[in-house]
Amino acid sequence: MCCKITCFYCKSYINKKEARVLAFENDKNMYFCPMTQLEICTGSYESALAALHGGADRVELCSGLEEGGITPSLGLVRAVCKLQGIRKHVLIRPRGGDFLYTPAEQEIMIDDIFAAREAGVDGVVIGGLTATGDIDMAFCRKLMDAAGSLSVTFHRAFDVCRDASLALEQIIDLGCMRLLTSGQAATAEAGIPVLCQLVQQAAGRITIMPGSGVGSQNAARILQQTGATEIHASARSDFHSKMEYRHGGVGMGRKDADEYIWKETAEEVVRAIKQEIL
């Protein structure tokens, strides 16, 4: 590992803004990844392994993907941080629902960032809005301060904000390295026109990373039509339980769901997306 990357973590040597610039370069160069980067949203250790083996450049680790993702357990974060050859970002979101957080929730999110840093993550994924649908700059600055020199992605809270153009400038001003967005549409493919505008407006000041509904059938097209250089997917398929005894008719919270079938990131799906975007 070169001294530049080592110095990335030395707060006594560089200030936070400079550290985040190094984080941005580190994302691109640390594992000699091609310029087009693939981030996989993973909800378990097995999914993170599948992302690694499938050739993903980075994982966004979270739980509760069915509700858009929430902060994963510290145990899961620590386990995934032991994996070599892939960068690990952690979602900081205390619950599903909107992105207007109470003071107590805000403190939880700040504490979660500190815990993630101590666990050894490479970056965090954050966001927060005001009641009027704008970026909550005061709160998000606190999250950025807690993140220190970590790489920071602003998540899809952006997709439900009031003014996309203004919000992008605010996110850049915060010092975020990356914006995960569907272009304020249900899927990234449907949001291509707005994604194009965001890439043009960003003009290299921040990475625009399309996400939502991304698969091997459309990843390359989304990248080509938007000019984006990174893309985000969950790459999931059905995982069938190995339980021999099954007690039917009892659910654990998911309505009309079979508790013996769930979604996991699939190595072959990750690999298919990766091959399409090379």
Annotate the PLM regions:
Residues E46-L49, Y101-D112, R162-L174, V214-T229, ...:
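Catalytic cores of alpha/beta
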Residues E60-G69, A115, A119-A131, C176-E189, ...:
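Glycine-rich phosphate-binding active-site loops on the catalytic face of alpha/beta enzymes
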Residues G54-V59, Q84-I86, G120-G123, A146-L150, ...:
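Glycine-enriched alpha-helix->loop->beta-strand junction motifs that scaffold or abut catalytic
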Residues M35-G43, I92-I108, T153-D163:
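Active-site mouth loops of central-metabolism enzymes
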Residues E46, E66-G85, L129-A147, C161-L166, ...:
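Active-site-adjacent beta->alpha loops and helix N-cap segments on the catalytic face
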Residues G69-G96, M137-R156, P193-G215, Y260-L278:
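Alpha-helix-loop-beta-strand connector modules within alpha/beta enzyme cores
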Residues G75, V80-C81, I86-C140:
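Glycine/small-residue-rich loop that forms an oxyanion/phosphate-binding "nest" at active or ligand-binding sites
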Residues T36-I40, V59-L61, K88-I92, V124-I126, ...:
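Hydrophobic faces of well-ordered beta-strands that scaffold small-molecule active sites
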